Amino acid sequence: MTAFQQLPSSVLQTGAIFLSIIIEALPFVLIGSIVSGLIEVYITPDKVYHFLPRNRWGRIFFGTFVGILFPSCECGIVPIINRFLEKNVPSYTAVPFLVTAPVINPIVLFATYSAFGNSFHIALLRALGSIVVAVILGIFLGFFWQEPIQKENRLACHEHDFSHLSPVKKVFQVFVQAIDEFFDTGRYLVFGCIFASVIQVYVPTRILTSISATPLFAILLLMLLAFLLSLCSEADAFIGASLLSSFGLAPVMAFLVIGPMLDIKNILMMKNYLKARFISHFITIVTLVVLVYSLLIGVIL
């Protein structure tokens, strides 16, 4: 205890903020990991394909909103999308699912609601932002994109077929998948919590004030931060909430909306399965739509 008392107060404050953020976030990461394990073991692309509407618009909106029923963390969403495409689920259904599934599911929405002090409107704004991006991407792919988005000689997807397992073994595999997901996500969460706590303690308030005074720059900065941190969608709301007082609502909303869509690990996984031309269009559309959406929030709210 004496050793801790000898540490500078700034270090102790950083540690306290770090612990407060991570303790709030971990239960949601754990729940999300278990749900992800359930989906991995029990939900197959064939089952989803049977429920697809017949018309193009219906399929765009199906892909946009089906994530409410089948929540999936963005950490493993790209291989799932690859399997959908291989089962002839159209790209204008699969890609909107990629964008919204990590955001509009009940776990992430409740995590966002809790992180911002039981704020329903921030959770709603986040969901609305991801829906807008998903619909625009779906329209682009459904009506303007004329080629497959998958690579012809793509790397083999690391998948497992659990359909032949007994019920007991399936339950066991759910926990195996959940544990793997939890620890994979946890390392990104720890880094993000450290970063957020260091910013609050060591970055001078005048610097943060000058950044937030220029909305466009603040939005772009937090979009870049979301890309670099590569946080799990069950946990990023707690990091975003810790940045709200420093940057304001519009930049934090950009952070929350773009994070599950564009980050380092997702882009690297996309390169394994999807064409570079599509990825460049995807990055451009997502970035522009999130930027405009966040600027509008700054103007209206």
Predicted regions located by residue number:
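Interfacial helix-start motif at the membrane-water boundary
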Residues: E24-A25, G63-L69, L228
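Membrane-embedded helical hairpins/re-entrant loop segments and their flanking transmembrane helices
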Residues: S36-V66, L208-A213, I239-G240
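Short glycine-rich loop/turn motifs that provide flexible caps or phosphate-binding loops at active sites
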Residues: I31, F62, V66, C75, ...
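Selected transmembrane alpha-helices and immediately adjacent juxtamembrane segments
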Residues: T2-I34, D46, H50, L124-M223, ...
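Structural signal for the C-terminal ends of transmembrane alpha-helices
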Residues: L38-I43, Y202, I264-K265
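Membrane-interfacial helix-loop connectors
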Residues: F70-L128, V203-L274, F278
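Short helix-loop boundary/capping segments at the starts of domains
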Residues: E24, F28-I31, E40, T44, ...
